[in-house]
UniProtKB/Swiss-Prot annotation:
Alphabetic keyword roster: DNA-binding, Plasmid, Transcription, Transcription regulation
Domain of life of the source: Bacteria
SUPFAM superfamilies: GntR ligand-binding domain-like, Winged helix' DNA-binding domain
Protein known as: Uncharacterized HTH-type transcriptional regulator in the TAR-I ttuE-ttuC' intergenic region
SMART domains in UniProt: HTH_GNTR
Biological source species: Agrobacterium vitis (Rhizobium vitis)
MF annotations from Gene Ontology: DNA binding; DNA-binding transcription factor activity
Transmembrane parts of this sequence: none
Domain (HTH gntR-type): residue spans on this chain: 30-97
Coiled coil stretches, renumbered: none
Pfam family membership, one: FCD
DNA-binding region: 57-76
Length: 171
C-alpha cells in the first residue's frame, strides 16, 4: 500500500504547480484537475501505482492534499486515456499495458519521430546546431542517470529528448 504523501514525493515532480498551493483559492478548478491528473499519471508512469494497484478516490485525494472533486475528474480523464478503470464505489484500478498496446505505442512513436528527424534535417545549420545541443544534453542526462541507476531520472531525460525532437520539428 502506498503511504500517505508518497505521491507528493515521487509523482508530483512534473506537476506544473506545487500541490501545497492547490488547497488555496488562487488555483482554478481546472488547475486542480490538471495537477491531480498529472500527479496520478506520473505515479502510474513511475510505478508508484503499478498495474493492478487499486486505490479509493478519497485516499488519493488525501495523498494529494486536495478535495475529491478534482481527483474524481482526473480519474475520468485517466480512464479515457486507458490508464485506469473506475470501479464504482471502490475507486480505481491501474490498467496494465498489453503487448499489443506497447507495440502500437512504439510503431506510432517511430513514425512520428522519424518524420520529425527528417524535418529537422532540412532546417538551417545554426538552428540545427541548437537543436543538436539540446538533444545531446538530454542524451548525456540519460547516460548520467543510468550510471547512478536512477530510472526515474533516465525516464525524465528520455522524455525531454523525445519532446525536444518533436517540438523543434514542429516549429
Amino acid at each position: 500500500m502506498v503511504k500517505p504523501g508518497q505521491i507528493l514525493r515521487a509523482a508530483v515532480r512534473e506537476t506544473a504547480e506545487p500541490l501545497t498551493e492547490l488547497a488555496g483559492d488562487s488555483v482554478s478548478s481546472a488547475g486542480r484537475v490538471s495537477a491531480a491528473y498529472h500527479a496520478i499519471r506520473n505515479a502510474i508512469r513511475t510505478n508508484v501505482f503499478p498495474p493492478g494497484y487499486q486505490a479509493a478516490e478519497i485516499e488519493i485525494a488525501r495523498q494529494l492534499g486536495m478535495s475529491r472533486t478534482p481527483v474524481h475528474e482526473a480519474m475520468a480523464r485517466l480512464q479515457e486515456d486507458g490508464l485506469v478503470r473506475i470501479l464504482p464505489k471502490k475507486g480505481i484500478i491501474i490498467c496494465a499495458l498489453s503487448p499489443a498496446d506497447i507495440e502500437e505505442i512504439y510503431e506510432v512513436t517511430i513514425a512520428l519521430e522519424g518524420a520529425a528527424a527528417s524535418r529537422l534535417a532540412m532546417i538551417d545549420a545554426p538552428v540545427k546546431a541548437e537543436v543538436v545541443a539540446l538533444l545531446r544534453d538530454a542524451t548525456e542526462a540519460m547516460v548520467a542517470a543510468l550510471e547512478r541507476n536512477d530510472l526515474p531520472g533516465w525516464a525524465a531525460a528520455d522524455e525531454r529528448f523525445h519532446e525536444t525532437l518533436v517540438a523543434c520539428a514542429a516549429q
